[in-house]
Structure formats: C-alpha cells, structure tokens
Amino acid sequence: ECGYLYFLPGLAPDKNHYAAQVGSKMKVESSEDGVSWYDCGETNEKSHVFAWQAYNLEHQGKYVRLTALNEKVTISEAALLPAAKDKVPDIKAEGPGAEYLVDEHETVPLYKTYMNSSYFDEIYHARTAYEHILELEPYENTHPPLGKHIISLGIRIFGMNPFGWRFMGTLFGVLMLPALYHFIKNLFG
C-alpha cells in the first residue's frame, strides 16, 4: 500500500533551447486493481526545483497514475512510500520514458532535509548555475553571474546534487580566511 508520492522537480531546456522548462503540476490517481482509479488531486505547480516534495495520497493503493497537466512538467525522480515511511520500495513504471522516473530509487530520502534538497536561496542559485551549464537564459539575474559560474564548477565536478552546488562556496569561504588574515594584518600592522 502506497501512502505518499515523493518526487523531485527538475528542469530541462525548452523546445528552442533558450530557457528552462520547469513544472510539477500533475494529476495523481491511485488504484487497488489497476482498473478503477481514485482521484487523489493535483500536485502544486509552485514546487521548488531540486527539493524533494511529498504528496499525501488520499486513497492508498497498489498502483499510482501520474498525468502531466501541462507540457512544462519536469520530474527528475519519483517514488512511492508506504504510509509508515520506513523504507523506499522498488517500483515499476510503465509508459514512454517512465523508467527514468524510478531508476534511482536508492537516492530517494525518507524525509526532506538540507542534506538532500535545495533550501533558502539555493532554489535560485543552484538552479541558475545549472542553467549556465546548460547554456540557458538564467532564471535569477539580479546578482552578477560570477558566483553562479563558480557554483557551476562544483556541479560540473561533483554532479547536480547538494554537495556539488555547495562545494565551491565552502572552498572559497575557507580560502578567503588566510587572505582576510593577511589583509587585516597589513592594515593594522
């Protein structure tokens, strides 16, 4: 019995490879037999990119059907969790390209935390750094892009995950300390 749908909203280039295509508006249905389907509602369109989302299934069942409600829906990974949330079971997906939704079930967390999702301003900066890698028009353009290009180096080295988008900022913060020490020492003698 499935109690929760977990999914990770992502982004992909649009048809013209100009801007990012982002969306998570899906119709969710569940079934015990795969024939009679119960409407469980719709997911939120305003989900944060690269942050795991949990959707409570109103009607628990053995089967879950997801239907994209617009062409912008981009989901990187999905999983079904039992109501007890004690483990992430293996699931089978059917439909064109559906196998890619469930191919990394071992990466699905039982709970959303800062260790597995973007939070605070990372929803802008990690996303924009990834858009720079994909050579897309950046979503966030209020700050100069140098910082996001530096973040994108960490993503290129370690992948599009929390470690990848946090590494370069941490490294530059550590390297800044000796520079700051010498600057202050020279300033005050």
Where are the predicted features?
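Sec/Tat-exported extracytoplasmic proteins
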Residues: P9, I133-L136, I157
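Transmembrane-helix motifs of polytopic, lipid-linked glycan transferases
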Residues: F163, F167-F188
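Transmembrane helix-loop junction
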Residues: E131, R156, K185-N186
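Extracytoplasmic catalytic/substrate-binding loops of multi-pass membrane glycan-assembly enzymes
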Residues: E94-V108, Y114-A126, P138-I150, M160-F163
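Conserved hydrophobic/aromatic pocket- or pore-lining residues that grip, position, or stack substrates
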Residues: A129, I150, I184
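Regular secondary-structure segments
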Residues: A126-L134
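Aromatic, loop-rich ligand-recognition surfaces of beta-strand-rich domains
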Residues: E1-D39, K46-Y114
